[in-house]
Design a protein with these regions (language model features):
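Activation corresponds to long, low-complexity, non-globular regions
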Residues: 1-38, 176
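Trp- and acidic/polar-enriched beta-sheet ligand-binding modules for extracellular glycan
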Residues: 3-8, 44-47, 57-74, 94-176
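Eukaryotic beta-rich interaction modules
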Residues: 20-26, 31-75, 86-87
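A short glycine/threonine-centered beta-strand motif
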Residues: 78-80
Length: 176
């Protein structure tokens, strides 16, 4: 898979929350994880259940979760590419209401992996507080970033500090 074929590639959100950039990469990789194809590297704050890179596989039926601890995160490193993000979709796992679903988080972008700029922030949000809930968040397209971080900034709906995700999808434009 040549990264150049994704230069100036764009998918904007319409009404299909999990048919974005990762879904397209998955298809172009012959229905393989884009991380296995070398297109992206996914870096969790830690991993104890499954592989964090699976959150970008369309229709993944399991989930990734972090250890208990403050400010867990997952970073999407586009390596040779950069993304101008305009929307993202999150899907939580199959736990009941008021369990470990995200409640407060931020999405941040960086080009050096150290200094991050805020892209979107959700505080005390209840959109994902149910079994397999999903939601898409849209905003003005960002500058191009190599790294996108989803950082949990407060306790989840269970009042704990572990992060759980089933699926993540990004929309916007990729460039070299």
């Amino acid at each position: 898979m040549e990264v150049e074929e994704f230069n100036n590639f764009s998918i904007e959100y319409t009404d299909k929350p999990f048919e974005g950039i990762f879904s397209h990469m998955y298809s172009k990789c012959g229905n393989k994880n884009p991380q296995a194809c070398g297109l992206i590297n996914i870096l969790p704050s830690d991993k104890i259940c499954n592989n964090a890179s699976n959150v970008i596989i369309p229709n993944w039926k399991q989930h990734w979760f972090s250890f208990f601890g403050p400010n867990p995160f997952i970073i999407f490193d586009f390596q040779k590419l950069k993304i101008s993000l305009s929307s993202y979709s999150l899907k939580t796992y199959s736990g009941n209401e008021n369990y470990g679903h995200l409640q407060s988080w931020s999405v941040q972008g960086s080009n050096d992996g150290d200094n991050y700029s805020l892209i979107n922030e959700q505080k005390e949000n209840h959109d994902l507080n149910s079994c397999s809930a999903f939601k898409t968040y849209s905003f003005e397209k960002t500058e191009p970033f190599r790294y996108i971080k989803i950082l949990m900034t407060g306790n989840n709906h269970a009042g704990s500090d572990f992060m759980v995700l089933r699926n993540v999808e990004f929309f916007g434009t990729l460039s070299l």
